[in-house]
Amino acid sequence: MVTKSSRWQMGMVFAGLLCAVEGSFVIRTVTAAGGAPPVKMTKEEDRKKMMDALGIESLRPGKAGRDKTDPNFANYDESKANPYPKLPDPLTLKNGKKVTKASEWWNKRRPEIVEDFDREVYGRVPKNMPKVKWEVVNTTNGKNGDVDVVTKQLLGVVDNSSYPDIEVKIQLSVTTPANAKGPVPVIMQFGGGFGAPGGAAAAPNAGPPYGPNAFSPARGGGFGAPGAAAGAGRGAAGGPGAPRAGAAGAPAGGAGRGPAAGAAFGAGGGRGPQGPTWQQQVLAKGWGYASLNPGSIQADNGDNLTLGIIGLMNKGQPRKPDDWGSLRAWAWGASRAIDYFETDKAVDAKHIAIEGHSRYGKAAVVAMAYEPRMWTVYVSSSGEGGAKLHRRNWGEIIENVAATSEYHWMAGNFLKYAGPKTWDDLPVDSHELIAMCAPRPVYLSAGKGGYDDEPNGDSWVDAKGTFLAGVGAGPVYRLLGAKDMGVTEFPARETEVGTNADLAFRQHASGHTDGPNWPFFLEFSAKHLK
């Protein structure tokens, strides 16, 4: 039994292990007696080690995302966007047989697709994952707008008895209406921290210290340059917001820059200059919201792959080629959050949605695909490695994600498709990731995009490639008795398709932000509340 006194002592030790420095955290690692400490490698060293294991001598460079005069500038010409127009058929087994029954999808084809994503794209979650013990460390009564709310701050302590050198403490907050008459649906967002008391959005880069091996989260999860400091991508308001530049330059060995200039930043999301925050929009429906800190699960960089949950499971050693990357680790953390929600009487655990923007949009669709308890998902500007088709030559491409700034998101095997192999050699594509979510509702989103929309647009994430992935998942939705978007032609900007279906898409008229489409996602979700 944990007493108030012991909780206080735990909190003081927890806070004392870290020192906040300009939005990041200095971590003091204490090596267990008799245990080998985690291997220390830079991301360049780690990626080179993986390339050597795969027999890869060099990788193709990623595209530049900002400078239109760069000879390696990203392609935004639709006539050059589809070098590999034939996608893998989600309803054809590897033996060539067509899938015509739902049972064949569940028992045969879906497992084939999962295996390909596990081995080649996102990596495998280790067997015998440790237990996570959730503890409410703070409860606050307050207001968000004009709604009385209760906010719980939690730590999910991962059992590290197999390797005490590494501690993982998952940071989660959940806010519910104080006057709710029963359990409420919860929209969980990747990318926050504990949040501010009373449920208000925390300021960018603010928050309490993280666990002893946890790291400063990429709060907005935005682009910035590959290798940019965590926090590039969303504004405190989250609507169009004030433009703000990302970190300058890619590190040596990295890809070209991703577009950050003009993108909105921060943790809040969901409003323009004066409108309600996304959290207030959720509360207006009588629902709750949650914030899951990915940095408390696994660092968003390749320098720390021997730490975090990945390092814990590998006992501080480097990854194997099919080991999981950060996206799959963050998705695992979302599943553990659902474990907690199933014990919280204020939460309707059958209606947990997940939302993520940019890199966290990638994590959100991965979480939805792998976690059957997830109700619905809002995938915002996820780009390459998320809902965008891998085979599309538009904006961010496989080579960008294989750079030292981003490779840690994926399995090591993913590097092959930026080196000796081509995009077309991938056994799967992102329409099949969306199909893994079927028949549950999926909302796909991106901002304006095209050569003339830069540098203040969302071209990098390929709105059309995301839409086409949704189209490609449609046959699986129909097979399972669900409704696809009902269209195959890319819709006009600000035209929602799939409004009354199980798959929906909308391209808004702003830049790299999730703000404008929050109201549409919430209306979409409400139609699927059963």
Predicted regions and their residues:
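Mobile cap/lid helix-loop segments that gate and shape the active-site cleft of serine hydrolases
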Residues: I309-M313, K320, R336, T376-L433, ...
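Glycine-rich nucleophile elbow surrounding the catalytic serine of serine-hydrolase chemistry
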Residues: G356-M368
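Alpha/beta-hydrolase fold nucleophile elbow
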Residues: A346-S358
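C-terminal catalytic histidine-bearing segment of alpha/beta-hydrolase fold enzymes
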Residues: W409, G457, K464, L468-K530
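N-terminal pre-domain segments of enzymes
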Residues: V30-R124, R219, F223-R271, L522-F524
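Conserved strand-to-loop "acid loop" that flanks and positions the catalytic carboxylate
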Residues: A438-V461, H508-S510
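Cap/lid segment of the alpha/beta-hydrolase catalytic domain
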Residues: V186-A346, G383-N393
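N-terminal cap/lid segment of alpha/beta-hydrolase-fold proteins
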Residues: A102-S103, N107-P111, Y122-V184, G191
